[in-house]
């Protein structure tokens, strides 16, 4: 859980991508007319060839970002930081252009908070490392063993990796790769990161002025909403937290999730209200960034959707040079990325995204018709995206549904720099 910073980079000209999307749509319409006339059956999945996989994942279990103001504090022992031997895998971090790793203001902030026991706030633990290794093993089973899609050893020509410039995400990526490739590699592992003020792998409230302004009023009044307000007061009273302490459902959930993931002794009342705390954290998030507020959702994850979309279009474009396409794209993100991302795709289940959760996007081509399809999985379960007839979605239908929220870098910067913005929710 973080509050982010936004701006955007991309590699393919917008005009080219638009033309590709239009041609794809026209071809799809023509095929649909033929199929309707001939009364053809649904797509034969045995004739589908996997062409590309994109995986967005949340980091593994970590220490809380901010301790609760309680007399009895949970002890976070540095032994929890021991690195499991099977997760050891060397990597290098660069900026998006391949230059030196950018400075990480978030890691500096986390090191200002020392928890009882000696750990810093927001540190990936061995539990989190094992979770990420297990996710990597699942991906290996899916794309190396069950389907011989990826090489069994890491090949930099097949895999592109990008992470937010936060240490727990970089280390989570290391562990995932160790599980996926069993610590075997044919070349250097490069993890690409961006500057905090231009990051788009999370909603960048710090740099996107309009997003910050549109949601400011709702952030200030979220804890005062009917239902949320009463439940927050009840939890704080039962836990002995003073009403003046700035503790909301986000902070409560952050602590209860971290403690439960590590089986640490917790405040009994925190455990008792765990389910309600999660639900109210979700309610609060949806109040701040509601699905009806299209522009805010666009600014929150539109640039990231644009990256995912561009990868899809480049993969299906025969003119794209082979060295510009990877079989696997990995993106290390956060819970605050997942909620708006899942909302825009129409698959949010109203549960807080857990540690090490993944959203996997597969791109297929039909061997006979040459048509393209997308398949989505969240937390390992097949999903039906908004605007799609079923789990196996024609690419043009998927892109059309995404286009409601996708933002090119130019449009993103234009929206973020608007000077006249009504603060959503301030007039309620």
From Swiss-Prot:
- The principal location of this protein is mitochondrion
InterPro entries per the record?
Answer: Acid_Pase_AS, His_Pase_clade-2, His_PPase_superfam, Histidine_acid_phosphatase
Give the result of residue 257 to F/L, as annotated. Answer: Decreases enzyme activity by interfering with water access to the active site cavity
Q: Keywords assigned by UniProt?
A: Hydrolase, Lipid metabolism, Mitochondrion, Phospholipid metabolism, Transit peptide
Q: What is the effect of changing residue 106 to F?
A: Decreases enzyme activity
Q: Name one GO biological process term.
A: phospholipid metabolic process
Classification via SUPFAM superfamilies: Phosphoglycerate mutase-like (SSF53254)
Chain segments carrying region Substrate binding: 58-168
Any idea which GO molecular function terms this record carries?
acid phosphatase activity; lysophosphatidic acid phosphatase activity
Q: Where in the cell is it found?
A: Mitochondrion
* Outcome, altering residue 285 to W: Decreases activity toward substrates with medium and long aliphatic chains, but not toward substrates with short aliphatic chains
* Effect of substituting residue 334 to A: Abolishes enzyme activity
**Where along the chain is the active site annotated?**
59, 335
Keyword ATP-binding in the entry? The reply is no
Assembly: Monomer.
Q: What is this protein called?
A: Lysophosphatidic acid phosphatase type 6
Annotated source species: Homo sapiens (Human)
Q: What is the lineage of its organism?
A: Eukaryota, Metazoa, Chordata, Craniata, Vertebrata
């Amino acid at each position: 859980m973080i509050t982010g910073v936004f701006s955007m980079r991309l590699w393919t000209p917008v005009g080219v991508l638009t033309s590709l999307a239009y041609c794809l749509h026209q071809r799809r319409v023509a095929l649909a007319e033929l199929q309707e006339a001939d009364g053809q059956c649904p797509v034969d999945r045995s004739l589908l060839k996997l062409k590309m996989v994109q995986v967005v994942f949340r980091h593994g279990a970590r220490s809380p970002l901010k301790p609760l103001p309680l007399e009895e504090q949970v002890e976070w022992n540095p032994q929890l930081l021991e690195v499991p031997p099977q997760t050891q895998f060397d990597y290098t971090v660069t900026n998006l252009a391949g230059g030196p790793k950018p400075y990480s203001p978030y890691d500096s902030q986390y090191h200002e908070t020392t928890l009882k026991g000696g750990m810093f706030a927001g540190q990936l633990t061995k539990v989190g490392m094992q979770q990420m290794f297990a996710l990597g093993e699942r991906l290996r089973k899916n794309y190396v063993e069950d389907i011989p899609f990826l090489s069994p050893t890491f090949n930099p020509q097949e895999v592109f990796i990008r992470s937010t410039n936060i240490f727990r995400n970089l280390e989570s990526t290391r562990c995932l790769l160790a599980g996926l490739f069993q610590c075997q590699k044919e070349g250097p592992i490069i993890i690409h990161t961006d500057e905090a003020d231009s990051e788009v792998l999370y909603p960048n409230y710090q740099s996107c002025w309009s997003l910050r302004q549109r949601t400011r009023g709702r952030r200030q009044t979220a804890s005062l909403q009917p239902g949320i307000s009463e439940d927050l007061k009840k939890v704080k009273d039962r836990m002995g937290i003073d009403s003046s302490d700035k503790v909301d459902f986000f902070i409560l959930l952050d602590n209860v999730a971290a403690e439960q993931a590590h089986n640490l002794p917790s405040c009994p009342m925190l455990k008792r209200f765990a389910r309600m705390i999660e639900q109210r954290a979700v309610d609060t998030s949806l109040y701040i960034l509601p699905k009806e507020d299209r522009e805010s959702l666009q600014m929150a994850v539109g640039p990231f959707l644009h990256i995912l979309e561009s990868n899809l279009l480049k993969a299906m474009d025969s003119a794209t040079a082979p060295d510009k396409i990877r079989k696997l794209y990995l993106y290390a993100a956060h819970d605050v990325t997942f909620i708006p991302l899942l909302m825009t795709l129409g698959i949010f289940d109203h549960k807080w995204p857990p540690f090490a959760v993944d959203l996997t996007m597969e791109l297929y081509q039909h061997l006979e018709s040459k048509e393209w399809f997308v398949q989505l999985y969240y937390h390992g379960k097949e999903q039906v995206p908004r605007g799609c007839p079923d789990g196996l979605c024609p690419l043009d239908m998927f892109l059309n549904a995404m286009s409601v929220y996708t933002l090119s870098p130019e449009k993103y910067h234009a929206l973020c720099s608007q000077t006249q913005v009504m603060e959503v929710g301030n007039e309620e």
